[in-house]
Amino acid sequence: MSKRILVIEDTENNRRILNDLLTNAGFEVLEAVDGEKGVAMAAEQRPDLILMDIQLPIVDGYEATRRIKANPELRHIPIIAVTSYALSGDDAKAFAAGCDGYFAKPFSPRVILAKVREFLT
């Protein structure tokens, strides 16, 4: 059974790139377009890993991560922040919110696949 990855990303083009990359690598991909839907989908679908954009509508990625990690049934799911915030200290904010990993956009497909596989093995 392939591992399920939830991509929480509001930009359609970024979702498509991640979906294509992960699907071609043999993963099942679920998608949410905002933090609120992402939290709900994480609870319903129980993915093996979450790729979380930080700048999201309705509920941002920091708050969505905090909500997921506050749920005892979900807190074990690794969350990797994928963000266009490449400023100093943003990785620390992502980790403080509960993220387990961090990528700045634009990202290398090879590097992101290696990190995803690292968390899923």
List each model region and its residues:
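Active-site beta3 strand of CheY-like receiver
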Residues: Q45-L51, L56
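Short hydrophobic/Thr-rich beta-strand motif most characteristic of the beta2 strand and flanking loop
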Residues: G26-V33, M41
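The feature encodes the CheY-like receiver
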Residues: P57, R75, L87, K105-P106
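Conserved acidic carboxylate
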Residues: E9
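Charged docking surfaces used in two-component/phosphorelay signaling
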Residues: R16-N24
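C-terminal output helix
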Residues: F107-V116
